[in-house]
Amino acid sequence: DSNGTGGPAGTLDKPLVMRSDNYHVEIAAMGIPATDKTYQVFQCTWWASVRRAQIGKPVDGYMGNGGDWNDSARRFGYPVSDSPQAGDVICFEPGVHGSDPSYGHVAVVETVNADGSILISQSGRGWMSVVTETITAQSLAAMGGGISFIH
């Protein structure tokens, strides 16, 4: 039953609440409203903004398109690096890892695993949903300068 609730996911203090398919995030069960003042609901930027606010690491309401977030973060004084930490926003430059070739993509790092892989949560990849993805350390390394992490 894809509408059932699965277990928690991630290592943040406020873990994701998963549907029974362990792919879709149950945002209503997490108390996250499907509204926002500045980002279009269910776009990647909306999810990164509301998830960061939920974990106590809010971002500015005007960071731009996903691929712009790392540059905006630097302008706003947020630390940006090439090393992931749980709670970071991962910023994909346009066209990297299947992101939109014009707009790029952002997601939230939920877990950094001992093997260097990361679990991310993201929106803007499907119809009106938030989903998870594990990216291997090898894939992250292959993306090189096409990704960055906003702490």
Residue ranges and their predicted role:
Residues 3-114, 119-123:
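Secreted/periplasmic proteins that engage bacterial cell-wall peptidoglycan
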Residues 110-151:
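Aromatic- and glycine-rich peptidoglycan recognition patches
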